């Protein structure tokens, strides 16, 4: 299990436990990672396909993000949005630390988390 925290306040925002991502404040499950797909937990609707280093809108088929080993890029413009490592996610333009990850995440879990954070 891992926690996503707001970097400046230290407040826990999400818990990531295997295939489930839960809102820490409400205790409600928000997303489920189903293989290479991210599913809205409440509705069961497929939201994103996260295969091959890309984040694609499941409904429209439109590519949204490119996720490499340390960066998140906007697919259309190619602009770097964020940088990350195993414990910190920061805004690329400002260098400001956005989120802290407490705990271990697999590659699939970190990709899913980045998709959820930066697509919306």
Residues covered by each model-derived region:
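Long terminal segments
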Residues: 1-19, 25-28, 35-36, 43-45, ...
């Amino acid at each position: 299990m891992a926690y996503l925290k707001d970097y400046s306040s230290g407040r826990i925002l999400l818990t990531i436990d295997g295939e489930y991502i839960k809102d820490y404040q409400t205790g409600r499950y928000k997303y489920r990672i189903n293989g290479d797909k991210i599913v809205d937990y409440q509705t069961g609707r497929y939201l994103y396909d996260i295969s091959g280093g890309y984040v694609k809108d499941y409904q429209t088929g439109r590519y949204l993000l490119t996720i490499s080993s340390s960066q998140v890029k906007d697919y259309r413009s190619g602009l770097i949005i964020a940088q990350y490592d195993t414990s910190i996610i920061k805004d690329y333009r400002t260098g400001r630390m956005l989120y802290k990850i407490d705990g271990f995440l697999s590659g699939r879990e970190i990709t899913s988390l980045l998709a959820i954070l930066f697509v919306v």
